[in-house]
């Protein structure tokens, strides 16, 4: 949780080097694109740059991924030498000739077998993982505690699997009109889609 005006980190529950190193060692053998979020900034192994060009996500998202990350020659060395913790990893995949996403299922099975992390999809068939006890719902409750707000007085809006925890934690959970069926099923309300000003929509 960051204070936007100052950039100050108010709360963090990140993966330490001991947890993330064996996972990264495996991921670095796969033909995927990965981002590590450390201290609120995104870092990408240099070998993933070419893979980023092959992603089939919308061009705006691809451009964001390519232009906003710091590229690292050796991400493991960077983490070790600076004694850093990783807040979240985001993985993106590109399709083979038959349309299947290369290495996605292999990576998914590897990640979900690790009880120390939580793995979800954040959209466009990506995979994201954090510590098992770190998710948006935990973050919302911690923010409410910091602000002195009753969690029942909060509202959260989301559309994909990585929003389920925060929708369930909020006093009022709202699903976007373009949300997955699972998100809509857990929400208290469903608004319009993200192309129709859904957040500002009034029921």
Where are these regions (language model features)?
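Conserved acidic, metal-coordinating active-site core of Asp-based
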Residues: 22, 26, 30-32, 37-157
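Acidic, Mg2+-coordinating phosphoryl-transfer loop and its flanking beta/alpha structural elements
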Residues: 140, 153-187, 192
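Short secondary-structure transition/capping segments
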Residues: 5-7, 47-50, 132, 165, ...
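Glycine- and other small-residue-rich loops at beta-strand/loop junctions that grip anionic moieties
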Residues: 12, 129-132, 192
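Conserved active-site and cofactor/substrate-binding residues in soluble primary-metabolism enzymes
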Residues: 18, 135, 194
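Conserved small/polar residues in nucleotide/adenosyl-binding loops
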Residues: 202-203
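Alpha-helical substrate-recognition element adjacent to the catalytic core
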Residues: 1-24, 31, 40
């Amino acid at each position: 949780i960051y204070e936007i005006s100052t950039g100050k980190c108010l709360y963090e529950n990140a993966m330490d080097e001991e947890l993330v190193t064996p996972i990264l060692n495996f991921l670095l053998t796969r033909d995927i694109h990965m981002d590590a979020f450390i201290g609120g900034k995104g870092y990408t192994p240099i070998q993933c740059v070419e893979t980023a060009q092959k992603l089939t996500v919308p061009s705006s998202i691809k451009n964001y991924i390519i232009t906003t990350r710091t590229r690292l020659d050796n991400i493991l060395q960077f983490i070790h030498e600076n004694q850093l913790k990783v807040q979240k990893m985001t993985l993106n995949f590109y399709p083979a000739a038959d349309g299947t996403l290369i290495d996605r299922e292999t990576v998914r099975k590897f990640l979900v077998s690790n009880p120390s992390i939580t793995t979800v999809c954040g959209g466009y068939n990506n995979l994201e993982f954090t510590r098992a006890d770190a998710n948006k719902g935990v973050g919302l409750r911690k923010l409410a505690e910091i602000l002195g707000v009753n969690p029942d007085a909060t509202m959260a809006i989301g559309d994909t699997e990585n929003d389920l925890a925060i929708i369930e934690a909020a006093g009022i959970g709202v699903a976007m009109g373009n949300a997955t069926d699972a998100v809509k099923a857990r929400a208290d309300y469903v608004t319009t889609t993200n192309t129709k000003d859904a957040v500002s929509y009034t029921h």
